[in-house]
Structures are given as structure tokens and as C-alpha cells.
Curated annotation (Swiss-Prot):
Gene: FAN1
Cofactors named for this entry: Mn(2+); Mg(2+)
UniProt PTM: Ubiquitinated and degraded during mitotic exit by the APC/C-Cdh1 complex.
Principal cellular location given in the protein's record: nucleus
Residue span of region Disordered: 98-120
GO cellular component, one term: nucleus
Top-level class of the enzyme under EC nomenclature: hydrolase
Cofactor: how bound: Binds 2 magnesium or manganese ions per subunit.
Domain remark in the UniProt entry: The UBZ4-type zinc finger specifically binds monoubiquitinated FANCD2. The KEN box and D-box are required for interaction with FZR1/CDH1 and essential for APC(CDH1)-mediated ubiquitination.
Pfam families named among the record's database cross-references: FAN1_HTH, Fan1_SAP, FAN1_TPR, VRR_NUC
Biological role stated in the UniProt entry: Nuclease required for the repair of DNA interstrand cross-links (ICL) recruited at sites of DNA damage by monoubiquitinated FANCD2. Specifically involved in repair of ICL-induced DNA breaks by being required for efficient homologous recombination, probably in the resolution of homologous recombination intermediates. Not involved in DNA double-strand breaks resection. Acts as a 5'-3' exonuclease that anchors at a cut end of DNA and cleaves DNA successively at every third nucleotide, allowing to excise an ICL from one strand through flanking incisions.
Record protein name field: Fanconi-associated nuclease 1
UniProt similarity note: Belongs to the FAN1 family.
Residues recorded with modification Phosphoserine: 182
Length: 1025
């Protein structure tokens, strides 16, 4: 090296200068623009050309819902010749074939993708998936004495080199010559292997480097993830026995049965070395297992599948001999083409066992052949299957079926009589917001390329209405887009035609109300009619689901999900949440606890009762939406309308029946819903600073005890605040506090809040003349706990919100600065204090332990009406007093055992419940709260029986009011088993009344509790240095 000599093995450097002596001139810049990535890529499932960036969406929404593609095993699929016979590949093994060395990146049997432009603009199918050419094996003898060696793709620099480009072009040229020389059969079927697709994709390196759809492209390296070289030696070709088909599979006009023109496609999962999974929405898992006798058996795992026996009969000898003849007649160069195709069946035995093909197969068709079964998934997409499950569940129950009249039952019957495409489209439209939709904006290719006949069928059946029935100007204006509204505004010469959409809509509505200037001609249309006509002309064809059938299906969904939270009953969502739950359960991704459904009490007396409840539930949903959006005036108008409707219903006879229902069923009555609306009205009036009206509403709510008794504490507390703070009425405020403390429904935090307000009023100088009113107050005492103070660096931030702290992390060698919450600052402090374990879970930590220790009691049988459907995460009476009352002896016995149990027993009980119920959806259990079962067992060992039994008793007695306020942190030392329960308070934060009560209760149970105050260091306005 000192003499300036290069090393012997050093590769000669390539000059970077452009020299005239070079053999190959640099390509023109035009070639760069000619080789840009294509705008569309071929879908690996259905072979359609789709936009590059829509490939994921296409696979999820269209290919996955293609009913005509059914996964079956390759060894059950026969290649078909022109005579209609098929080759049975089930027991065919290609042996004694050792393909020669060949890199999959430098061989392809398909034309260059750039040639697709020459085939015409109208082409919508990738040339790689054309099924009009057959694969020809030529030179079988050559194949028997060669090894296949899969070479890795190499570095990026080698792929970009000119030498690599030249070699690739020469290989493509040879492949084109091979394709032109090979005889083709017009009736043959092309079978594409993943290796072929790898070659095609490699010819578009630029696509791989620039596209965002890399996960949908086959990769050659994944074929040989564990090994880089595969070879098969000393094998023999066995001839398969042929047999005649005993029965021909039935055909369907929509889903053709297995035939000679059925194309075969491979899933991308093959190239990743994974077992093939169906891309349909059925989530079926297909496995191939070999029995004792060597025969392959197909196993389908799914919630519900139909098995169809399909005969795969063929003349294997004739077809196989044809292949051998073609391979023997091929040239040596052409043998490479056979090698690529043979890699699929011969290169790797493990890969061969995972191959699954797709053929169109009609559901329900069958051909009787022994030991040959193919499981066909349900033909409907997931949303239609879930919708049908809901309909079946409701109308199979006599109590629910009686809530619909004959006309409504006929509507459901008509829906069942619709075609599959019409049912799919209706469910899609039903799940969308209830409004008019432009027909040219609807695009559901998985349903039908042209939706016009499907829409016509739905319109004729009475499920859809078209623009001919669109007569409301406000609805037409909402249908128009912003550019269309501006065009319409210019037509009518509005003052500000380029304004916002809502401003233009309001202007048009005001203009339509103006009287016409022309006084002659009474038959002349007014300005509103003219605007309506012009607007409908701009909107074009439109449609909307009819209100009548939609209301019927909405009530069906309401009955099906009656036990769900009423906040989820969004009128505009079309039951999306309920259908999603059904889907997840059917797919096995969601599982509810095991319990016995026991429905004894009828909630709704008749159809009108259900309709009133549904109307009130939708009104509550509309008011909640307006409040969430900050539209307080609109929310006030809606609440006043609801109040008027409720006043008309107060004398209805059905309300007396509702009053006698158990409390946990009374919440599904119309009176309960309107009471919740009036409670929301109080908040709306307070937001609008209408405190006088708010006080009247609160007094009206407190005057009844039938509905929402669990909210009485909040109502009393709010009434006292309005009278004391906002209206300055001291004597009524004191009387309110006295009555509130005497109310047995006022509990925990609200009771303490009222008592503390009374103490403040008693000490106030302005209340000296009312001190005699405080003599009858019941005393509420709460003990204090230990307080500690730590400091933390506050992150500079603007506006409101939780405080964010800056904390140093990492070791001395790799220091780092992280942003964290106030609870994480406290956890770091206690970690330095010797507590090696800690959880920030607030109430979910203790409710999870409560659910694990009392799981069998919470979901026990024998209690009527607490479990009314199969999708409940908790019993209906969990948050009522009847929960403890109906399970009193069992709960008392369990609490006694927990109180006196040693640590080993507690660990065993938690482990038994965890292992038996893990993953099931239960509202009180958060399975991700603990990192593992071991951590949960360690915590119960540290807490001990007395603390656990005391917490469980309080939660079981009044879960509604006691589930909140538990300490933020639980920290413990895994060696000494010392634990501490900590409530963390950041800057400008203080303890709530519920937190005070829980800290006092836990301290009485013997737990080490304390309040950790985190004081900020630094000002929010200052920046970090």
C-alpha cells in the first residue's frame, strides 16, 4: 500500500467521467420520463388494474368482499384441457426434477409491464393475469440434472448498475423469444406462481422504491427466509389415477361453478412463508394436514361454514404426458422458463404444502365424491351477514316480534326477497347518515359495477326514494357542493356568491321566503320554486332511503342492542356499533362472558310503547350531539321540544306499568329517557346563564322519585350551588342542603359536598340570622391522610390542559429527555424510594381485581332479567342496589373468604379466573391493566385479604357511586411486599370529595395511603434552555 499498489483483490474502480471511448452511451433523459412508475398496479387477487395508492383499499373493500372467489387447495384443482377433462393434482408428486440454477430476479415468462400501454387504453386487467395462455414445460430431461439456487436481490448499487440493466434486458428478450416459440392452447389455464410474480415485480425496481404499496407486492427473498438454496434430487414423477366426475356442480348466473375457464390465483401470503389466509371478510383459516394414510385433508376454521364436496376428476396420464412432450421439445434456453414454474411445486416441499388456489364456486353446490371436501365460506359480506343476524335474533323472539305490526313485518319479508346485491346496497345506505345522496357519488364495485338496476329494484320495493320526491329546498341545498352553490348564487346574483356554504344556504332560504315582485299571474311559481328547480338541476339524480322502512330497521337494532349504552344509540349511524359487535363476535375477535339468558319481564307493553321510547332515544342523541358541538341554542330548542312532548305523556297509562318495573329495567322506558333529557336541559340553561330557569328544572326533577334516582345527589348539589352562588338566595340554599342530606339517594361525594357547603355557609357573616337552620344537619366526617411534596420540571405550554413535565431518562452513557404526565413524575419518585413496581390505573386497577375475585358471582345464574341478550359485558343490575341484594349470601361468603385468605390462596384465585376468562369483554375488567398475570398476583399478595375484601365490599354495594375516586397509583416492593396507595395532584389541583372518602376508607382498612403533590419548577411562559 505504501508503494501505491492496489490490493490484489480490490475491484477495479469505475470512472465517473463521461468518455467518448465508452461502448455504451448514457441514456437520454427521455428514458427517465418514459419509465416512471405506472399509475395503476395489478391486484394480486382479482387481477384488476387499480390505482397505485388505492391498492390497500381495493384489497380491503373490494377484493375481500368478492363473493365469486373461494379459496380451495391447489391439490384439489385440476388443469383442464380442451376436452373438458382435468388433471387431478391431489396425489401427483413431481420427482426426479432438479431445476438448474436461476435467480428469480432474472427470469420472467411475462411481457414487460411497459408494453401494457400498447394493448389499448381500455384494458383494465393486468397482462400478468390473463388466462388465455398456457405454461409450457419444454426440456424435461434438462430439468432432471440441474439444481435450483435462489440468489438474493443484492445491494441497491448493483441493481442500479448498467451491467445489471443490460443483463436484465437480455433475459427479458430471451423470455419473449421463448413465449413466441411456445405453442399455446386456447382453452388452457395459466397458473401463475409467486416466483413469476417476483420476476415481474423486480423488473420494476423504481415502482418498489417509490410506491407506498410495498406490502402488497410479492418479494422473492421471503420465499427463502430461512434458506437461500433449495434443491430437490432423486425424485420420480408419479402418475395420478383418473376418475370420472359422478355429478356436475351446479352453476349460478352470478357465481359460475368449477369449470375449465376458472382462473387460478395465488395469495400474496404465500411468498411470506405463512399459511394462506382468505382475503374475504370471513376470516377463514385454511390448513393442510396430512393424515396417517398420506392423504391430505382440508380443515376450515370458522364460525359457520358450509361444506361442499367437489369432484376433481381428470385424465392425468394424458395431460402429464403432454407436458413432458412440450418440455422435451424445448430449447436449452427455454428450460429456464420451466424451472421458474416448477419452483412452486418442486423447489420446496414446505412451500408446496401451503399452496392454496382460488376458484369461483357457488355456495351450496355439491358434487358427491368421497374424501374430497371443500369448505365454502358464506357468500354475503360481513355487514350484510351481521344485519341478517340482528333481524333473525329479534324476530325469533316472540316478545320482540309482537312489537311490530303486519305492515312492518311485510317490510322485513320484502327485504329478504331482495336480490343479494340489493340487500348489500341497502345495508350500506342504511349505515350512512340519513340524508339525500347523489347517485353519481355512489360507488360500490363489490356490489355491482353499475348500481342503476340495483337502485331500481330497491325503489320498486319501496326502500329508496329518488329526486322526484325531493321537494324541500333546504335538503336540495345541503345536497349541493360548495362550487355548485356558488354557481347557483351567481345565477341569482346574490350579494356574496363566494361566501361559505352555510352562509349561502341561509341566504337562499331567506330569499325563498320573500314574496314575489310580480303581482300578475297567480299560477306563476314563486322565487322558492324557481330556486328549487335550478338547484335540483345542478344536483342531478339523487336518492335516499325511505323513512318508513328505515324506522322499522332502526327499531330492530334498538331492540337488539337495548342493553347497550344509550349514548351509542346515534340515530344517524344506522346501528354501526351494533353491527360491528356482531361482526367481531362472529369472527372470533370478541368474546363475551358465559352466562344464561333469562328474560321474564316484558319491558314494552305494545308497539306504540316502543315507538315512543325510540323517539325519545333519538331526541336524546340529537341533544347530546348539539351539546358536544357547542351548539347550546340549538340544544336548548331541542330540549324544550322534548319537554313539551314529555308533558303530554305524563298522564299516559303505560307509565304506571313502568313504575313497577325493577330499577335496572326502568331505565329502558320512555320516562327515564325524558328525565335524562331534562337533566341535560339543566346543563344547557346553565351554559346560557339562565340560572332561574335551571333552578326550576332542578326542582321539577327532584319532585319525582321514579326515574334516575342515582342522579339525585348531583341535582341537590347543583341546586344548592345555583341558589348560593348565582342567585344569592341563602335561606333557600340552606333548606336545599338540609333536604339533600336527608335524602337516602344522596351518597358518597355529593353528600360530602353538601355538608362542606353547609359548613362554609354557617361560618359566613352573611348567614348569622340563619344559624338556627343548621342545627338539624347530620355530620359527615372524613379523616386526613399523609401528604408529601415533590418537584418536577414543567414543560412550557400555552392554553389549558393537563400539565406536562420534562424528565431526564436513560443512563449516563445515553441520556435522554422525555415529556411525561404528573403521575409518571410521581412514579419515578417512588421508584427511587425503593418501590420497584408501580401501576397508574386509578379505579381500573381495583375494579379489575374485584372482577377477577368475584367473576362467578357477578355472572351467576338464577337472577331473572339481568342477562337479556348474548352481547352483554355486565349484568344489568351491576350499578343498582339490587345487585348486592340479589346476591347477598354469595357475596358475603366470598368476602369473608377473601378477608381471611393467605397470599397463596389469593394468588390461586386470581390465576384461576384469569386463565379461564382472559380476553372476554367485561366492563369491570381491563385485561391490559396488568402487564401479566404474575404482576396481578404480586399485587394481591401485597394488598392482602383485609384491604381487598373492604374494597370489593364497597364496590359490590354501590358500584355506581364508588367506581370513581380511587387512588391514581399503586406502588409496591416485590421483595418486602410493602405497598402504598397514592393520589397524585399536580399544580392547581385538589382532592375531589370522592377521593377524600376513598383515601379515608382505605386508611381505615389498614392501607398505607398518601397524597403526593407535584410542585412545578419553572414558569409555563419560559422556554427550555
Amino acid at each position: 500500500m505504501s508503494e501505491g499498489k492496489s490490493p490484489a483483490k480490490k475491484r477495479a474502480r469505475r470512472s465517473l467521467s463521461i468518455s467518448k471511448t465508452k461502448k455504451n452511451e448514457c441514456n437520454s433523459i427521455i428514458s427517465f420520463f418514459n419509465n416512471v412508475p405506472p399509475a395503476k398496479l395489478a391486484c394480486p387477487i382479482c387481477s384488476k388494474m387499480v390505482p397505485r395508492y388505492d391498492l390497500n383499499w381495493h384489497l380491503d373493500e373490494k377484493c375481500a368482499n368478492n363473493d365469486n372467489i373461494t379459496p380451495v387447495d391447489l391439490r384439489h384443482v385440476g388443469f383442464t384441457d380442451s376436452s373438458g377433462s382435468t388433471v387431478n393434482l391431489t396425489n401427483t408428486v413431481l420427482e426426479n426434477v432438479t431445476p438448474g440454477k436461476l435467480s428469480p430476479s432474472k427470469a420472467s415468462l411475462t411481457p414487460d409491464p411497459s408494453d401494457s400501454a400498447k394493448m389499448g387504453i381500455k384494458q383494465q386487467t393486468s397482462p400478468y393475469f390473463k388466462n388465455n395462455k398456457d405454461l409450457v414445460f419444454k426440456n424435461q430431461d434438462k430439468l432432471r440434472h440441474h439444481n435450483v439456487k435462489v440468489i438474493t436481490l443484492g445491494s441497491l448499487s448493483s441493481k442500479l448498475s448498467r451491467r445489471y440493466t443490460e443483463a436484465r434486458r437480455s433475459i427479458c428478450k430471451k423470455n419473449e423469444e421463448f413465449a413466441s416459440k411456445s405453442p399455446q392452447s386456447p382453452s388452457s389455464t395459466v397458473v401463475r406462481s409467486p416466483v413469476d410474480n417476483c420476476s415481474e415485480i423486480e423488473d420494476k425496481d423504481q415502482i418498489l422504491e417509490n410506491s407506498s404499496q410495498k406490502e402488497n407486492v410479492f418479494t422473492c427473498d421471503s420465499l427463502n427466509e430461512q434458506r437461500t438454496e433449495h434443491s430437490v434430487e432423486d425424485t420420480k414423477v408419479l402418475e395420478a389415477e383418473s376418475q370420472e366426475a359422478t355429478q356436475e356442480c351446479g352453476r349460478s348466473p352470478l357465481t359460475p361453478a368449477f369449470s375449465d375457464n376458472a382462473f387460478v390465483l395465488f395469495s400474496p401470503d404465500l411468498t411470506r412463508g405463512n399459511p394462506l389466509r382468505s382475503t374475504s371478510e370471513d376470516s377463514l383459516e385454511w390448513e393442510t394436514i396430512t393424515g396417517i394414510d398420506g392423504k391430505d385433508v382440508e380443515k376450515c376454521e370458522a364460525g359457520s361454514c358450509e361444506e361442499v364436496k367437489v369432484t376433481v376428476a381428470s385424465e392425468a396420464k394424458t395431460q402429464l404426458s403432454d407436458w413432458e412432450a412440450k418440455c422435451h421439445s424445448s430449447t436449452p434456453d427455454d428450460s429456464k422458463g420451466c424451472n421458474i414454474q416448477d419452483l412452486l411445486l418442486e423447489g420446496d416441499s414446505d412451500l408446496k404444502n401451503e399452496i392454496t388456489c382460488r376458484i369461483p364456486l357457488e355456495q351450496g353446490s355439491s358434487c358427491d365424491v368421497p374424501d374430497k371436501t371443500v369448505t365454502v365460506p358464506p357468500s354475503h359480506p360481513y355487514y350484510l351477514r351481521s344485519f341478517l343476524v340482528v333481524l333473525k335474533a329479534v324476530f325469533e323472539n316472540e316478545e320482540d316480534r309482537m312489537l311490530f305490526d303486519e305492515h312492518e313485518k311485510e317490510i322485513v319479508t320484502k327485504f329478504y326477497q331482495l336480490s343479494a346485491s340489493a340487500q348489500k346496497l341497502y345495508v350500506r345506505l342504511f349505515q350512512r347518515k340519513f340524508s339525500w345522496l347523489k347517485m353519481n357519488k355512489l360507488e360500490y364495485e363489490e356490489i355491482a359495477p353499475d348500481l342503476t338496476p340495483v337502485i331500481g329494484e330497491l325503489q320498486q320495493a319501496g326502500f329508496l326514494q329518488t329526486e322526484s320526491e325531493l321537494q324541500e329546498l333546504s335538503e336540495v341545498l345541503e345536497l349541493l357542493s360548495a362550487p355548485e352553490l356558488k354557481t347557483l348564487a351567481k345565477t341569482f346574483h346574490l350579494v356574496n356568491p363566494n361566501g361559505q356554504k352555510q352562509q349561502l344556504v341561509d341566504t337562499f332560504l331567506k330569499l325563498a321566503k320573500q314574496p314575489s315582485v310580480c303581482t300578475w299571474g297567480k299560477n306563476q311559481p314563486g322565487i322558492g320554486a324557481v330556486i328549487l328547480k335550478r338547484a335540483k338541476g345542478l344536483a342531478g339524480q339523487a336518492l335516499r332511503v325511505c323513512k318508513g322502512p328505515r324506522a322499522v330497521f332502526s327499531r330492530v337494532l334498538l331492540l337488539f342492542s337495548l342493553t347497550d349504552s344509550l349514548e351509542d344509540e346515534e340515530a344517524a349511524c344506522g346501528g354501526q356499533g351494533q353491527l360491528s359487535t356482531v361482526l367481531l363476535v362472529n369472527l372470533g375477535r370478541m368474546e363475551f362472558p358465559r352466562y344464561t339468558i333469562n328474560r321474564k319481564t316484558q319491558i314494552f307493553q305494545d308497539r306504540d310503547d316502543l315507538i315512543r321510547y325510540a323517539a325519545a332515544a333519538h331526541m336524546l342523541s340529537d341533544i347530546s350531539t348539539a351539546m358536544a358541538n357547542g351548539n347550546w341554542k340549538e340544544a336548548n330548542e331541542l330540549s324544550q321540544c322534548a319537554k313539551s312532548d314529555w308533558n303530554k305523556l305524563k298522564s299516559h297509562p303505560s307509565l304506571r306499568y313502568h313504575e313497577n318495573l325493577p330499577l335496572f329495567l326502568r331505565c329502558f322506558t320512555v320516562g327515564w329517557i325524558y328525565t335524562r333529557i331534562l337533566s341535560r336541559t339543566v346543563e344547557i340553561l346553565q351554559r346560557l346563564h339562565m340560572y332561574e330557569e335551571a333552578v326550576k328544572e332542578l326542582e321539577s326533577l327532584l319532585s319525582q322519585r321514579v326515574y334516575c334516582p342515582d342522579s339525585r345527589g348531583r341535582w341537590w348539589d347543583r341546586l344548592a350551588l345555583n341558589l348560593h352562588q348565582h342567585l344569592k338566595r341563602l335561606e333557600p340554599a340552606i333548606k336545599c342542603i338540609t333536604e339533600g342530606l336527608a335524602d337516602p339517594e344522596v351518597r358518597t361525594g355529593h353528600r360530602l359536598s353538601l355538608y362542606q357547603r353547609a359548613l362554609r355557609l354557617r361560618e359566613s357573616p352573611s348567614c348569622q340570622k340563619y344559624r338556627h337552620l343548621f342545627h338539624q344537619l347530620p355530620e359527615v366526617t372524613v379523616g386526613d391522610v399523609k401528604h408529601v411534596t415533590i418537584t418536577g420540571r414543567l414543560c412550557p405550554q400555552r392554553g389549558m390542559g393537563k400539565s406536562v413535565f420534562v424528565m431526564e431518562a436513560g443512563g449516563p452513557t445515553a441520556p435522554a429527555t422525555v415529556l411525561c404526565s404528573v403521575e409518571e413524575v410521581a412514579l419515578a419518585y417512588y421508584r427511587r424510594s425503593g418501590f420497584d413496581q408501580g401501576i397508574h390505573g386509578e379505579g381500573s386497577t381495583f375494579s379489575t381485581l374485584y372482577g377477577l375475585l368475584l367473576w362467578d358471582i357477578i355472572f351467576m345464574d338464577g337472577i331473572p332479567d339481568v342477562f337479556r341478550n348474548a352481547y352483554q359485558a355486565s349484568p344489568l343490575d351491576l350499578c343498582t342496589d339490587s345487585f348486592f341484594a340479589s346476591r347477598g349470601p354469595a357475596i358475603e361468603a366470598r368476602l369473608q373468604r377473601i378477608h381471611s385468605a393467605p397470599a397463596e390462596s389469593l394468588r390461586a384465585w386470581v390465576a384461576a379466573a384469569w386463565q379461564a376468562q382472559e380476553g372476554r369483554v367485561a366492563s369491570i375488567v381491563s385485561w391490559d391493566r396488568f402487564a401479566s398475570l404474575q404482576q396481578a398476583q404480586d399485587l394481591v399478595s401485597c394488598l392482602g385479604g383485609p384491604v381487598l375484601s373492604g374494597v370489593c365490599r364497597r364496590l359490590a354495594a354501590d358500584f355506581r357511586h364508588c367506581r370513581g375516586g380511587l387512588p391514581d397509583l399503586v406502588v409496591w416492593n416485590s421483595q418486602s411486599r410493602h405497598f402504598k396507595l397514592v393520589e397524585v395532584k399536580g399544580p392547581n389541583d385538589r382532592l375531589s370529595h370522592k377521593q377524600m372518602l376513598w383515601l379515608d376508607e382505605l386508611q381505615k382498612l389498614g392501607a398505607d395511603v398518601e397524597v403526593c403533590h407535584v410542585v412545578a419548577v419553572g414558569a409555563k411562559s419560559k422556554s427550555l434552555t
